[in-house]
Amino acid sequence: MLIKLEIPPGLYKNGTEYQAAGRWTDANLVRWFENTLRPIGGWQTMSSTQFSDVARGMHGYFDNSNNRRVIVGTTSNLYVYAEGVSQSNITPSGIVTGRNDAASQVGYGGQLYGEHAYGVARPDNEQYDPVTTWTIDNFGEDAVCSATTDGKIYIWENNPSAIATVLTNAPTSNQGVLVTDERFVMCLGAGGNPRKVQWSDQEAATVWTPASTNAAGSLEVASDGKIRAGIVVRGQVLVLTDTSAHALSYVGTPFYYTQETAGSNCGIISAKAVAVTGTAAFWMGEKSFFRYDGGYTVPIKSDVSDFVFNRLNQSQRSKIWAVINGQYNECWWFYPSSSSTEIDSYVAYNFVDDTWTVGTLA
């Protein structure tokens, strides 16, 4: 006699196999979609030309003539793939070379003098300078870009034969850049201030000094942490620090943007660990996952979080990268496991079916 097994979709990897009785406990390169188990499709090569170093930022869009543009930032270079044109190097002149790997701060000068008592063993809380990452967005058909170890804002004016150049008058020593729905260019961690957000005049990317005749301005998020990321969601700018979340809303003259705390104890684990759908943002924190849909940040119950965070290479966590696969209602996080210094694993969340899956890429 055959007995039909009613196994719920998704993986359960928190705890023992005994505790997961009646659930799937392991998988690789499969997904659950509409309550059915399906294989994950393969990958397709976009170009046979390899980069000289590792890609750490990417943004795709269409220009005003409906030509596809894909901007890719690597540790030391900036490239564009243009419709009908091969890879073009648009690296700006004088850019600061970045880091391929997170670097330990345990050397001389890496910590505060006198922080611990003499003769007492130090706690195991080694700190790391994060890997270089890029933020890239389009301002109309042009692209604005910034690398974390360089900090300047560059603009590429939609010409594959021309390199990107420094955006005139923009602040330096930034953590990132984005373009708001109202068409302000906005810098995160502006001028080296870890909590400062600064924006240009509306529709005028080179006007940054506030005046009665323009809408340029700035604010500081009310956080005890440092800004790591920002993303546009539901008409707001969601700013994520390493401890909290903040929603910036456009209010017009005279302040232009106001802020509200959208969550505490929900800091993001890396600068690229957030992705957005049309209605919500999802990100990975230090030990859990979070969602923001325009109200307040809520933690996402995960059936695989113990597995993921226990095998994560903490020293290289700044390489974690999130993407949305809208076709299957999924948010994916790619991360390096404890046996690798580069990304070799993934965890994916189906935000419609509320299911999880994991796997490896190598």
Regions found by a protein language model. Give the residues of each.
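N-terminal beta-propeller domains
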Residues: 1-117, 155, 174-246, 333-349
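Beta-sheet-dominated scaffold domains
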Residues: 2-4, 223-362
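A short beta-strand motif characteristic of beta-propeller blades
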Residues: 43-50, 119-124, 162-168, 214-220, ...
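Repeated scaffold domains used in trafficking and secretory/extracellular systems
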Residues: 52-61, 96-136, 169-182, 225-229, ...
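Assembly/oligomerization scaffold segments
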Residues: 65-68, 130-132, 137-141, 149-150
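Beta-strand initiation motifs
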Residues: 86-89, 160-165, 206-213, 253-258, ...
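Hydrophobic or amphipathic alpha-helical targeting/insertion segments
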Residues: 88, 139-164
